C-alpha cells in the first residue's frame, strides 16, 4: 500500500486557487486574442455572473477571515486577503477610515485586462459596495494604460 502524502496547506492553496486563477487568465487571454475584448467580457459575465459571485466571495472572505467594519480600512483588510490568494502585490500609501489608496505593482491579470481593464474597476466597485454601499472607488492610474502601477482610491463620505 502506498504511503499517504501529507501536502502542506499552503502548497494545496498554490495548486488549487492560484492554479485556477492562472487557468482562467490563460482562458480569457485566448478568448480575447482570438475573438476580441467584447467576447472576453461576455465570457466573464456569463461564466462568473460577476456581481452575484463577487458579492458572495466578498461576504464569505469577510466572515472566514473575521474582517470587521465597513470603512475603507475594512476594504483594504479584505484586499490584503485577496492579494494573498491571487498573487497580486502592492502597497497602501494612504490608509484611514474615510480614505485609503492602494498601488498594485504586480497583477497576474494584467495581460488579460489589456483592453478590458474596466472589468477590474467593476470588480473593485462590487467589493467596495458590498462592504459599504456608501463607499466609492476610483482608478486614477492603470497598468493597462501604460502606468507602472494601478492606483485605486477608496472613499467614504462622513
Map each language-model feature to its residues.
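N-terminal accessory segment detector
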Residues: 1-99, 107-119, 123, 129-149, ...
